[in-house]
Amino acid sequence: EKQEDERLKSWADYPSDDWLKQSLFALKQDTRLLDEFILKKGAEALRASFDKHQIQPEDMDYVLAHISSNYFKDGLREEFANVGLDFPVEKWYYNLSDVGNIGAGSIFIATEELMNSGKLKKGEKVLLCVPESGRFAYSCALLTVC
């Protein structure tokens, strides 16, 4: 919890009987920071990876991205486009509306769904992007269909 001046309120500022009632020792995330940073940092990290490995956005046939909420869907595409990774809408594959937010498992399920769809062709490139919101870290992988 924060004080009026935005500084964090210490557990020691609460009466001891409030410690359990208010879950003061539970780890919590300030989700307002997600809105401000997660998409931008992810786009910057992916751009750096593309540059380092001399990969071009037009080489991607599919982009699979884990998002925890549809709230992030358009924003993610926009932030990627802002750094020159303007993947056409038809290349994006999401399964959030079908399976819900299943966290780290979502990218594996989406990959399996795409594999079983019959759409993939030998040599196609599939980009996987997964954020870890606690530290604003992104993991990305580039797969080639065999």
Where are the predicted features?
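Conserved beta-strand-centric core segments of catalytic alpha/beta enzyme folds
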Residues: 1, 106-146
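Gly/Ser/Thr-rich loops at beta-strand to alpha-helix junctions
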Residues: 66-71, 100, 104, 132-136
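Residue-level preference for alpha-helix termini and adjacent loops
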Residues: 26, 33, 95-101, 135, ...
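Hydrophobic alpha-helical segments
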Residues: 79, 83, 99, 113-117, ...
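Hydrophobic pocket-lining "lid/loop/helix" segments that shape and contact the acyl-thioester
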Residues: 1-95
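Cysteine-centered functional microenvironments
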Residues: 90-106, 129-130
